[in-house]
């Protein structure tokens, strides 16, 4: 009877392996552009004052790029309309005139759709992998607890034969 349980366990986990393969991610800067890039010259980012060296026209070529801070001073004198942030952040910055930009580097991609330019913020795949790991862990825990309950119930009923 344990062969059936092992077979069900292997088949169940194989379906989870297929789902986990779809959650794999590539390098975080594969399809991103620096927002301050004009004419192939790297300019400091508006929100984090960071230059991305190595950005070129061939952006699909794989390679490692590093972020280099150009200054440690906070960014002032930037119009709020130029920053690619959500509306809740924009309202918070308008209410507080002494708000400064944080020194957090984010990835922004600029896409052109029907002549309009859309800026989106891309998240890394770590949250997806974490969520898949939690789901797999919970399912495995339920399976182990169920197997223990089945073994205990069989032993109590007298039908258990090792």
From Swiss-Prot:
Q: Tell me one GO molecular function of this protein.
A: protein-folding chaperone binding
Expression (tissue specificity): Highly expressed in placenta, lung, skeletal muscle and brain. Weakly expressed in brain, kidney and liver. In placenta, expressed on the apical plasma membrane of endothelium. In lung, expressed in alveolar epithelium. Up-regulated in colorectal tumors and expressed in 25% of early oral squamous cell carcinomas.
Task: Indicate the segments annotated as coiled coil, or none if absent.
Answer: none
Q: Which UniProt keywords apply?
A: Cell junction, Cell membrane, Cell projection, Cell shape, Cytoplasm, Developmental protein, Glycoprotein, Membrane, Sialic acid, Signal, Transmembrane, Transmembrane helix
GO biological process terms on file: actin-mediated cell contraction; cell adhesion; cell migration; lung development; lymph node development; lymphangiogenesis; lymphatic endothelial cell fate commitment; negative regulation of apoptotic process
Specify the glycosylation sites in chain numbering.
25, 32, 34-35, 52, 55, 65-66, 76, 85-86, 88-89, 96, 98, 100, 102, 106-107, 109-110, 117, 119-120
* Disordered: region residues: 23-57, 85-119
**Ranges of the Extracellular topological domain:** 23-131
Q: Which InterPro entries match?
A: Podoplanin_domain
Q: Which residues lie on this side of the membrane: Cytoplasmic?
A: 153-162
Region Requires for dimerization and lipid rafts association, residue ranges: 133-137
Q: Where is this region: Requires for interaction with MSN and EZR?
A: 154-155
Q: How is it modified after translation?
A: Extensively O-glycosylated. Contains sialic acid residues. O-glycosylation is necessary for platelet aggregation activity. Disialylated at Thr-52; sialic acid is critical for platelet-aggregating activity and for CLEC1B interaction. The N-terminus is blocked.
- Transmembrane segments annotated in the record for this chain: 132-152
Signal peptide from the UniProt entry:
1-22
Q: What is the effect of changing residue 52 to A?
A: Eliminates induction of platelet aggregation
Q: What is the effect of changing residue 159 to N?
A: Highly decreases interaction with the EZR and MSN. Induces an intermediate phenotype between epithelial and mesenchymal. Does not affect localization at cell surface protrusions
Here the segments flagged for biased composition (Polar residues) are 85-108
Annotated site residue numbers, Cleavage: 150-151
- Biased-composition ranges for Basic and acidic residues? 109-119
* Family, as annotated: Belongs to the podoplanin family.
Entry remark concerning the domains of this protein: The cytoplasmic domain controls FRC elongation but is dispensable for contraction. The cytoplasmic domain is essential for recruitment to invadopodia and ECM degradation.
Its assembly, as annotated, is: Homodimer. Interacts with CLEC1B; the interaction is independent of CLEC1B glycosylation and activates CLEC1B; the interaction is dependent of sialic acid on O-glycans. Interacts with CD9; this interaction is homophilic and attenuates platelet aggregation and pulmonary metastasis induced by PDPN. Interacts with LGALS8; the interaction is glycosylation-dependent; may participate in connection of the lymphatic endothelium to the surrounding extracellular matrix. Interacts with HSPA9.
What function does the entry list?
Mediates effects on cell migration and adhesion through its different partners. During development plays a role in blood and lymphatic vessels separation by binding CLEC1B, triggering CLEC1B activation in platelets and leading to platelet activation and/or aggregation. Interaction with CD9, on the contrary, attenuates platelet aggregation induced by PDPN. Through MSN or EZR interaction promotes epithelial-mesenchymal transition (EMT) leading to ERZ phosphorylation and triggering RHOA activation leading to cell migration increase and invasiveness.
Q: What is this protein called?
A: Podoplanin
Q: Which gene encodes it?
A: PDPN
